[in-house]
Amino acid sequence: MSKDINLDTHITDLVNVFKWEDLKDVCLVVHSYGGWPGSGALEQIGDRVSSIVWLDAFKPENGQRGFDFASEFSRKAFLAAVEKGEPGRPSPTAEAFRVISEKDRAWVDSKTTPQPNGVAIQPIKLTGAREKVAKKTYIRAAKYPQPAFDQALAECKADKSWRTFEATESGHDVMVDAPQWLVDVLLQVS
């Protein structure tokens, strides 16, 4: 990991996958932090995306930063990492993400990696490409407390161009807690 990694790095990674794989007519599904690079990438690849699914994800607006929405745990971890000169901070645990099964929590924790500090401090540059996608869906994981996701769900419910779903029996990692439910929803909306 490098101190040079920022939000633009992740946006570029996503854009390049679309370009190099010549992807078109894609249903772009983003989860959690993925709402940031997903929103940024749509500014460049929106014409290749036929539908989007924001899965318990941030829905940033122009000029916002991830740090502005961070939980107390994430803010403390970020500031501690910066103070120590570390390029990244630990990921929250699966327990903090309210993963339901103890076995699944152990598996998720074995797969998480630190997140680069730079992704939280760079403001995002958006012109509205996300809102131009014809088919938009927001899925909220009901058992994970996150005010920014509650706000995103409320905004999407109020905007008739978005479909909304709530994973009532799932923590933040819906793909772990309710995989078949998620597959059914994705097939319905993509």
Give the label of every model feature segment.
Residues 29-34, 38:
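Gly/Ala-rich beta-loop-alpha elbow adjacent to hydrolase catalytic centers
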Residues 39-43, 183:
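Short, hydrophobic alpha-helix immediately C-terminal to the catalytic nucleophile
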Residues 43-90, 94, 119-120, 148-149, ...:
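Flexible "cap/lid" loop of the alpha/beta hydrolase fold
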Residues 131-136, 159-161:
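Short, proline-enriched alpha-helix->beta-strand connector loops that line the catalytic pocket
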Residues 110-129, 134:
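Active-site nucleophile elbow and catalytic-triad environment of alpha/beta-hydrolase enzymes
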Residues 1-27, 43-44, 67-73:
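Active-site loop/oxyanion-hole signature of alpha/beta-hydrolase fold enzymes
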